[in-house]
Swiss-Prot record:
Keywords associated with the record: Amino-acid biosynthesis, Cytoplasm, Diaminopimelate biosynthesis, Lysine biosynthesis, NAD, NADP, Oxidoreductase
Entry EC number(s): 1.17.1.8
Active site per UniProt: 135 (proton donor/acceptor), 139 (proton donor)
Catalytic activity: (S)-2,3,4,5-tetrahydrodipicolinate + NAD(+) + H2O = (2S,4S)-4-hydroxy-2,3,4,5-tetrahydrodipicolinate + NADH + H(+); (S)-2,3,4,5-tetrahydrodipicolinate + NADP(+) + H2O = (2S,4S)-4-hydroxy-2,3,4,5-tetrahydrodipicolinate + NADPH + H(+)
Protein's recorded name: 4-hydroxy-tetrahydrodipicolinate reductase
Role summary: Catalyzes the conversion of 4-hydroxy-tetrahydrodipicolinate (HTPA) to tetrahydrodipicolinate.
Source organism of the structure: Staphylococcus aureus (strain Mu3 / ATCC 700698)
Keyword Cell cycle attributed: no
Keyword Flavoprotein in annotation: no
Pathway(s) the chain acts in: Amino-acid biosynthesis; L-lysine biosynthesis via DAP pathway; (S)-tetrahydrodipicolinate from L-aspartate: step 4/4
Gene responsible for this protein: dapB
List of residues binding NAD(+): 79-81, 103-106
GO cellular component terms, A-Z: cytosol
Length: 240
């Protein structure tokens, strides 16, 4: 499989290493600013890369969105987070002409976490729910795209829920419809996501901890391996 990388930060550097270990080939890189240290052919436009089988994106909206407005037809794996609604609308449009895969978290374990959460919410309907995510001190966006995905699962199963990001200015008791959303930034934490169900005299916690960023890179590669054989359409872990 011949792979074009969109972005060449820490994550796509891992994708390159792991993909080559699997026998795949990196045919080029698209970056905001070309760098002399990048060990692959650098391009400005997706359509300029004639021999790629798939593109894997671990970048940012500033790099990705202009590329998505260009004319190209290439299977696309997208892991960029930020401006999610705008991104999903654009990817849905592109999926009419090419296979597109999107996940805010490329770990299959996190996908399993969403399924566990979907099963737990109806069973624990009278429990309070708090969501917490923790990441390294260089992560810019908060809350994480994964935590937003977990919140979306809850919204799909409970009525009239309210996200609460900060209780500092709230001078009232917790309301039943509140869903607490908390972000922690520090050190080199790869990624942790926890769902707390708090009931009367008991709590249940469901936690996913990433121990290496390799799980995200491998998840993107595995998605690409499947996507190249798919017809045009929008794909997630649910239908890939």
């Amino acid at each position: 499989m011949k792979i074009l990388l969109i972005g060449y930060g820490a994550m796509n550097q891992r994708v390159a290493r792991l993909a080559e270990e699997k026998g795949h080939e990196i045919v080029g890189v698209i970056e905001n600013t070309p760098k002399a240290t990048t060990p692959y052919q650098q391009y400005q436009h997706i359509a300029d890369v004639k021999d790629a089988d798939v593109a894997i994106d671990f970048s940012n909206p500033n790099l990705l969105f202009p590329l998505l407005d260009e004319e190209f037809h290439l299977p696309l794996v997208v892991a960029t987070t930020g401006e999610k609604e705008k991104l999903l609308n654009k990817l849905d449009e592109l999926s009419q002409n090419m296979p597109v895969f999107f996940s805010a978290n490329m770990s299959y374990g996190v996908h399993a976490l969403t399924k566990i959460l979907a099963a737990a919410v109806p069973l624990l309907d009278d429990f309070d729910i708090e969501l917490t995510e923790a990441h390294h001190n260089k992560k810019v966006d908060a809350p994480s795209g994964t935590l937003e995905k977990l919140y979306d699962v809850i919204v799909s199963l409970k009525e009239n829920v309210t996200p609460v990001y900060d209780r500092h200015e709230l001078n009232e008791k917790r309301q039943p419809q509140d869903i607490g959303i908390h972000s922690i930034r520090g050190g080199t934490i790869v990624g942790e996501h926890e769902v707390l169900f708090a009931g009367t005299d008991e709590t249940i916690q469901i936690t996913h901890r990433a121990q290496s960023k390799d799980i995200f890179a491998n998840g993107a590669i595995q998605a690409a391996e499947r996507l190249v054989n798919k017809p045009n359409g929008f794909y997630t872990f649910d239908n890939l």
